[in-house]
Amino acid sequence: MQGRLSAWLVKHGLIHRSLGFDYQGIETLQIKPEDWHSIAVILYIYGYNYLRSQCAYDVAPGGLLASVYHLTRIEYGVDQPEEVCIKVFSPRKNPRIPSVFWVWKGVDFQERESFDMLGISYDNHPRLKRILMPESWIGWPLRKDYIAPNFYEIQDAH
């Protein structure tokens, strides 16, 4: 079943794939990495002015990595704002997705966390560097094929 936003994107010739609706009835769409930045700008202009959250996950061992964006269309006088979930999949070997920092500034730390934990590189992000792990850390701890080291250096917190 095609949702309202999917129908609007089709009407305007914007390439995407409908993934249906989640358990709360929120429309979920898949966007290709190369189309993501331009569609993000279009969604912002269309009224999706609030990025509620961004996260990422490892789809399967050796498989794709996904970056997920939850957007809300906040309008004056509307009790129930329209929401959409966007999924952008990227290959594990060289995961690159355009950053939407310049569209929604609130994605800054969230994209950095996704980079730090899964190794997804967000192109044109102004400060893409590790945020949780030390700069010297090797690997991406939330990937399903990550092998944890058998030792951890405990650092003094003083």
UniProtKB/Swiss-Prot annotation:
Q: Does the keyword Metal-binding apply?
A: no
Which cysteine pairs are joined by S-S bonds?
A: none
Under the cellular component aspect of Gene Ontology, which terms does the record hold?
chloroplast thylakoid membrane
Q: Return the InterPro entries for the record.
A: NADH_DH_suC (IPR010218), NADH_quin_OxRdtase_su_C/D-like (IPR037232), NADH_UbQ_OxRdtase_30kDa_su (IPR001268), NADH_UbQ_OxRdtase_CS (IPR020396)
Its subunit composition reads: NDH is composed of at least 16 different subunits, 5 of which are encoded in the nucleus.
GO biological process terms held by the UniProt record: photosynthesis, light reaction
This chain's protein is named NAD(P)H-quinone oxidoreductase subunit J, chloroplastic
Q: EC number(s)?
A: 7.1.1.-
Keywords on record = Chloroplast, Membrane, NAD, NADP, Plastid, Plastoquinone, Quinone, Thylakoid, Translocase, Transport
How does the record classify its membrane topology?
Peripheral membrane protein
Q: Name one GO molecular function term.
A: quinone binding
Q: Which PROSITE patterns match?
A: COMPLEX1_30K
Role this protein plays: NDH shuttles electrons from NAD(P)H:plastoquinone, via FMN and iron-sulfur (Fe-S) centers, to quinones in the photosynthetic chain and possibly in a chloroplast respiratory chain. The immediate electron acceptor for the enzyme in this species is believed to be plastoquinone. Couples the redox reaction to proton translocation, and thus conserves the redox energy in a proton gradient.
Q: Of which family is this protein a member?
A: Belongs to the complex I 30 kDa subunit family.
Give the reaction(s) catalysed.
a plastoquinone + NADH + (n+1) H(+)(in) = a plastoquinol + NAD(+) + n H(+)(out); a plastoquinone + NADPH + (n+1) H(+)(in) = a plastoquinol + NADP(+) + n H(+)(out)
Class of this enzyme? translocase
